[in-house]
Amino acid sequence: QHEEVYGLKMLDSVVKKWKPTDFKLHVYLEGYDGKSDGLPEADFIEYRHLENIQARTDFITRNSDKNGRFGEAPYNYRMDAVRFCHKVYAMSDLFFELLEQESKDWMVWLDADTITKKMFKAEDAAKILIPEVDIVHLGRIDIDYSETGFIGFNLGMHNACSLLVDLRGAYDTDEVFAYREWTDAFV
């Protein structure tokens, strides 16, 4: 599982390289049975469990067969809505909490294979999280959707908030299955 290989490396790099007073990291765990034993600890890291998001559980229960496997055909990750729902529900869970708090800050998603190589402070983040911009992401040229291993949402901007609401809605209502691909990046 990628989380076992990349997740711990990411967390170790964050603890060593992020300025603790500048950031708050919310880590969504899957399959840890409600525990976070053995994971790096820091005052700015909060562990949460995907299993506690009821809408995610409902989606998986309703759509367990939408897992990229169709009969004898080879696995197709582009049609694995179950795999890609985790990110959508984690992002939207935190977003709705921040919305209730009337946060106007940036909310940034980082995939578990993101490694911080040098010291990272708020001033560094400010270079890419520009106040006048709704969303920042890693664009691609040769593929028709963005790399979503890094995506930032300016919660002070209506369009960023609307996108998060719409993305969550696409999974809550199963609208995602009207698209030709079911990954979070495509939807």
PLM feature spans:
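Short catalytic/ligand-binding loop motif for oxyanion handling, primarily in non-cytosolic enzymes
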Residues: 5-6, 34-37, 116-119, 124-125, ...
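Catalytic core and acceptor-binding pocket of nucleotide-sugar-dependent glycosyltransferases
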Residues: 155-187
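Short acidic-hydrophobic catalytic motif
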Residues: 76
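GT-A fold catalytic core of metal-dependent nucleotide-sugar glycosyltransferases
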Residues: 83-137
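Residues that flank catalytic or metal-binding motifs in active/ligand-binding sites
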Residues: 87, 110, 146-149, 183
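A structural signal for well-ordered alpha-helical segments within the folded catalytic domains
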Residues: 5-8, 85-89, 181-186
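Short beta-strand-to-loop element that shapes/binds the nucleotide-sugar donor at the catalytic cleft/hinge
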Residues: 126-155
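N-terminal anchoring/stem segment of glycosyltransferases
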Residues: 1-73, 82, 97-103, 155
